[in-house]
Amino acid sequence: MTPPVLLYGHPPPTLFREPEGAVQVSPLDPGGVDLAETPEDAFASALILAPPGRLEREWVLARTLQLLPPGAQVIALAPNDRGGSRIAPALRAFGCEVTDEPRRRHRICRTLRPAHPVGLDTALEAGGPRLDPRLGLWTQPGVFSWDRPDPGTALLLGAAPALKGRGADLGCGIGVLALHALESSEVSAIELWDLDRRAIACARRNVAGARASFHHGDVRRMGQGGGDLDFVVMNPPFHDGGREDWALGAAFISIAARRLRPGGVCWLTANRHLPYEATLGEAFSSVHLRAETGGFKVYEAIR
């Protein structure tokens, strides 16, 4: 039986049709396979929508070349404004011969896996998980705010009081807000949710103890149950595929309200320009602006 195609992300259908039987390995796909744990020679070829960050992109390309047999085809593409022009140089640095074609505001690179690629270990180490001494936390290139404290999160940490009861950190990243919540001995349990498998893996290493549970999944598809939480903390995403999408944050707000019991509290931080006030007002009985800076704001919303 011919091995399947390795598929990373979802290339635009106007450029490529996803191969039948392909195995999705993007960390942003909860139903996918973990590329870091995949055995070698499990795939016949690869089709990659390359991520925008340099270290993340080079890690994906290096790991793909490590897994494929010599001579296997690799097609990697990205939009022009999200690193497309940097794919070919990265592949050439690994010892690949590359064709680089512009099409529909993308760059499409094709290569065959060389018999003896070079520099893979260096790229895998640079783009892999690490304990960041500045953060004091495990992190990895590609996850939210992976190499620096997020100012919106910091503002929320300074504004929120000690919490209690059962809670959730929606879009938890590497677990900063959950860690703060668990400083209170009155917090009995907290769920950590994130779409990014790498973020959940880091959060598992950062947030210890039986009170925390971890969920790799799309918060918007959490299910219909609700009314079981005393608090929610969150810094909801507002980008989808590199473009601003205010509906993402609005969906998180609605789901937070659904999960909270009457009287439960949601602490939310967001960029100042995001228009969440109307959604908060519709979903919660009372809403208070608790902190604000030039770029960020923090709300306390009571169910």
Q: For each of these PLM feature ranges, what is it?
A:
Residues 2-115, 267, 273, 277-284, ...:
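Accessory substrate-recognition/RNA-binding modules or partner subunits associated with SAM-dependent
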Residues 59-70, 250-262:
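A short glycine-rich, Lys/Arg-flanked "PGG" loop and its adjoining helix->strand segment in the class I
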Residues 79, 194-197, 248, 271-272:
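Short beta->alpha hinge that forms the Motif I/post-I loop of the SAM-binding pocket
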Residues 45-55, 170-177, 229-242, 256:
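Conserved proline-anchored active-site loop of SAM-dependent methyltransferases
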Residues 1-31, 150-234:
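Conserved SAM/SAH cofactor-binding pocket of Class I
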Residues 199, 252, 276:
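Conserved short alpha-helix immediately C-terminal to the canonical SAM/SAH-binding motif I
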Residues 101-164:
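SAM-dependent Rossmann-like transferase core, predominantly class I methyltransferases
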